[in-house]
Amino acid sequence: MERYDDDALVLSSVDYGESDRLVTLLTREHGKLTAFAAGARKSKRRFAGALEPFMRLRVHIVETRGSTVRLDGTDIVAGFYAAREDLSLIARALYAVELCRELTRDHEPQPELFALLESYLTRLDAKEAGPTSLLAFELSALAHAGLMPRFDSCSLCGGAPGERPRFDQAHGGAVCEPCGVRARESVAVPVALLSGLRALQEGARTPLPPELRARARGLLNVFIAHHLGRRLKSVDFMAQVGLD
């Protein structure tokens, strides 16, 4: 049996049995954990409000034989309560935590991804994260997962994308027009879109115009769904609240 404390962000939480919950956490030092919170649905004192998605916690963990993880207690560090009052901010936060949950494997430490997600949620809560910030977050999260799309050169031949570039999720990003014949699922994209995404990938924070931002969101949605094997549920929720 091993006991330890760690910093954590709640990625998801589901009911289990009559009184318990299973909580998926992204921890700073131990990576993604799915922990059993006994009596969480009945105890108003022990886990009061702590197990909701995108809560920032200090968690008390017990790991037993067979890799069973038990959540023994929590201390709320940040609830991001201002963000929880705005439906559009809730939608972005839920998307961010779902993306991180799907991009990570259990028990693989991801301190950089933890810091990235915590920083994004903090900026959302302070209303400092504009619409383009979500694209920047996605690109950084994909980079941490080793799934960085290619925007600066053709994913097939390595040459310049050219004046009539295309994008193909199966081949990892941009393809030039000649290679587009082989990339049957590729779609034509504006040069300005690839340039804008490449700038975000390199750390620029210049906002994209709404029309390019919408195209970029569409490309990344398809790219992520292809590599994960499914569409993220929170994408539909973002659409319902009018987000790109």
Swiss-Prot record:
Listed under GO cellular component are:
bacterial nucleoid
Q: Does the keyword DNA damage apply?
A: yes
InterPro entries with a match to the protein in the record: ARFGAP/RecO (IPR037278), DNA_rep/recomb_RecO_N (IPR022572), NA-bd_OB-fold (IPR012340), RecO (IPR003717), RecO_C (IPR042242)
Q: Which GO terms describe its biological process?
A: DNA recombination; double-strand break repair
Q: Does the keyword rRNA-binding apply?
A: no
Sorted keywords for this record are: DNA damage, DNA recombination, DNA repair
SUPFAM superfamilies, alphabetized: ArfGap/RecO-like zinc finger, Nucleic acid-binding proteins
Task: Note the coiled coil stretches, chain numbering.
Answer: none
Q: Which Pfam families match?
A: RecO_C (PF02565), RecO_N (PF11967)
What family, per the record?
Belongs to the RecO family.
Against NCBIfam families, the record matches this protein to: reco (TIGR00613)
User: What is this protein's function?
Assistant: Involved in DNA repair and RecF pathway recombination.
The record's annotation in PANTHER family points to: DNA REPAIR PROTEIN RECO
Q: Which HAMAP family match?
A: RecO
What name goes with this protein? DNA repair protein RecO
Name of the coding gene: recO
